[in-house]
């Protein structure tokens, strides 16, 4: 209930009587609802979870502090369910997540509420600001996700060799995470090889790993909704001097980023230190250096040259500098990192020394 009380405080400060929450991760955070196709409405008069008949039993079990509203009983309409709650609760000014509400739903809700002279007001980042600093329970879930991911990658390594396809390696990795207790994969796995490793979000395909390749693995496990995020780059068979040079630069850059992270640090500061390390290849360092991770893969704080957030104990971030040379390939090394009272603790522990397989 502490989360809800904080939301109600923010609503009061903003002159709102309630808020309609549509972003899936925000609904889970505020209610505990573990699935999809549910929406929350929070107001001083009560907490409501709006879903349909397929999910009402699950909602009742997982959200004991919420009244479950089946929109099938409200004219089979989500907007009409929102209208019914607002009228019943005496809401005069309702906030909604303007970045996560479709225009057609906004129009219909606005039309229905206008008939009752209820104002509909766009809001941003009310729940996200609460998610910025993780609770002990959230950190514990993230730790387990990281442990699962580490074990799965360790099991994958013997299979990274010439002749195996990216798709096969990806399948083995994802299966291993689930066998070790992952609720699901954290996000779509990036497992690419050869020149494809310059693609920041390349997709695994039927390409077979070859001697002299880099193999880049960017993956995560999900546990109780919380996501880990790790990247490691492996060499196969042999490496050139340039491959060694770039790998070691990226490793030094990544470790420099973690060393320069801690409470009170602005999100842009480590980027300047990383750029000093990769100066020779700076034109190929064009991705962000990291981001927050939790219920979403990418969430506040966003790290990089233009980052403005101040790190606080309990923030969970990634540190993922990379060098990407089109037509040649790329290297990325990434860890999930917890901001602590005294600095930064790396939660993913797979070795970062260059492994030649």
Give residue ranges: language-model regions.
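Active-site neighborhoods and metal-handling regions in enzymes and metal-associated proteins
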Residues: 1-357
């Amino acid at each position: 209930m502490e989360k809800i009380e904080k939301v109600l405080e923010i609503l009061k400060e903003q002159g709102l009587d309630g808020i309609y929450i549509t972003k899936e991760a925000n609904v889970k955070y505020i209610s505990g609802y573990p699935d999809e196709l549910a929406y929350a409405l929070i107001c001083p008069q009560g907490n409501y979870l709006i879903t349909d008949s397929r999910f009402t039993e699950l909602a009742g079990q997982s959200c004991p502090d919420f009244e479950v509203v089946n929109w099938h009983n409200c004219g089979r309409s989500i907007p009409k369910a929102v209208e019914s709650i607002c009228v019943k609760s005496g809401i005069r000014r309702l906030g909604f997540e303007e970045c996560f509400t479709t225009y057609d739903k906004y129009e219909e809700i606005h039309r229905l509420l206008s008939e009752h002279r209820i104002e509909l007001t766009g809001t941003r980042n009310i729940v996200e600001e609460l998610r910025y600093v993780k609770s002990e329970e959230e950190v514990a879930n993230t730790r387990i996700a990281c442990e699962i991911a580490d074990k799965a990658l360790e099991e994958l390594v013997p299979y990274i060799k010439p002749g195996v396809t990216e798709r096969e390696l990806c399948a083995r990795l994802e299966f291993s995470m689930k066998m070790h207790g992952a609720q699901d994969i954290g996000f779509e796995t990036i497992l690419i090889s050869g020149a494809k490793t310059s693609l920041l979000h390349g997709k695994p395909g039927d390409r077979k790993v070859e001697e002299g390749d880099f193999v880049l693995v960017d993956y995560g496990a999900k546990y109780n909704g919380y996501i880990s995020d790790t990247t490691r780059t492996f060499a196969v068979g042999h490496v050139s001097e340039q491959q060694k040079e770039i790998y070691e630069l990226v490793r030094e850059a990544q470790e420099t980023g973690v060393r320069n992270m801690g409470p009170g640090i602005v999100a842009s500061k480590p980027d300047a230190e990383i750029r000093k390390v990769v100066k020779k290849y700076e034109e190929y360092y064009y991705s962000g250096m990291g981001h927050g991770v939790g219920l979403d893969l990418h969430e506040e704080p966003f790290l990089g040259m233009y980052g403005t957030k101040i790190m606080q104990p309990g923030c969970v971030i990634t540190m993922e500098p990379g060098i990407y040379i089109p037509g040649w390939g790329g290297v990325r090394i990434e860890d999930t990192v917890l901001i602590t009272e005294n600095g930064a603790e790396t939660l993913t522990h797979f070795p970062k020394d260059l492994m030649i397989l």
